[in-house]
Amino acid sequence: MTIEQVKDYLRVDGDDDDNIIRTMMEASKEYIVSAVGEYDETDKTANLLFCAIVQNMYDNRELMQSDIQQRKAIEYTFRSIILQLQMKKAIKGDT
């Protein structure tokens, strides 16, 4: 995904945060590769997870302990999508 696509997802205007968004994009890709084994940029589910991870990083640059419930919900969502991607990869490997 391009930085412009990610900024559209984040609803970010301007270029002030481009460097930090690029860093978050790299970290998001590494996160997905570590969890699934690959990041298929043609997979819409993978792209959704990619953007959701970047958004989580961007929105929570200063995580607070009082937001534990919200973080747990986000982590559950990520795990659910990661499991779906792992299953897709396993199915592709069997064909």
Provide a role label for each language-model segment.
Residues 1-95:
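Divalent metal-cofactor coordination and adjacent catalytic microenvironments
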